[in-house]
Amino acid sequence: MKFQKRNIQLVLILLLILNNCFINSQVENSKKEKVDVSALIQSYGSELFNYLNNWNKVEENNNKNNNNNNNNNNNNNNNNKNSKVKNDDSIVNTFSNYGNQILNYLNIGDGGEKQKQNQKEKENQSVFSKFSNNVLGLFNFEKTKDKKEDEGILPSIIKNIQDYVKWGKNENNESSGDKYPNFETQSSSFSHSPYGDIFGININDIIASPLLNEISDSSLNYLKQQFGLSNQIIQLLIQFRNTIIFAITFIIFLFTYLIIYYLASIGNSIVISFIIGVLTVFLWVIITLLFTIVIGYKKNGEKTLEL
């Protein structure tokens, strides 16, 4: 199967947009290093892969050691060791750790400094009060001692949307030329995002690239035939396709994290953390499929779902 760069971009769009939303969701404390979201994702992907790859081997070792548990001390030691490996690599712990990392990054988990400071007060609050406070955190515009904005998720996304409007110009309102290379053309006329990127690919380059602007006539005809869309609706899709894609993604993103904020209000047990971890992975899968289905059409109208 011929390898196509464009198919890779379909997946990277999701990573880039979520990275752009995550990377500046809030200003970190002076003593706290900025989170490398791409490294975080890769680390949990590796953990999950290692778990799936080693599960059978660990299970077999545990069964053998359990059968020989009373034979000698060596077997007992091996059993304890393998049981510990299974516990460390279990799917529950993997997703629970993932959920805890998400909570800590959003500054609403047990590891968040604000959560620790207000823990005693929140113990006396109802679940609804905790949920309300967490949701208000989405719109957080508090000032720190350094008089910097401690941004919530939504203010950060709003600023990112404002940045999208200005792609093509840098901070000095000048064309950025080809200082930041594009994935396909190795040149770019769009500004480098100050919010970070993944794999050296700028999110503004992707949004402004022909990838999002290319819905061919054959693809539109395919949609028209399958769903009976009128020419007027097709024209609206052409005109507002980028806005529609972004809006759907934003709604999915927002509702998912409202659920996470609610779960964080209930408590921070291993079950809650596990659900949050699974929910976050589910969010990634859904948005990846969304972009693949909406944009993934060849010019002959065939789907390009295989990556």
UniProtKB/Swiss-Prot annotation:
The keyword Cell division does not apply. Keywords: Glycoprotein, Membrane, Signal, Transmembrane, Transmembrane helix. GO terms for cellular component: membrane. Glycans are attached at residues 124, 173. Residues 63-82 have a biased composition (Low complexity). Residues 60-90 are annotated as: Disordered. Residues 1-25 form the signal peptide. It is a multi-pass membrane protein. The chain crosses the membrane at residues 244-264, 275-295. It is found in: Membrane. Its main location: membrane. This is Putative uncharacterized transmembrane protein DDB_G0288661.
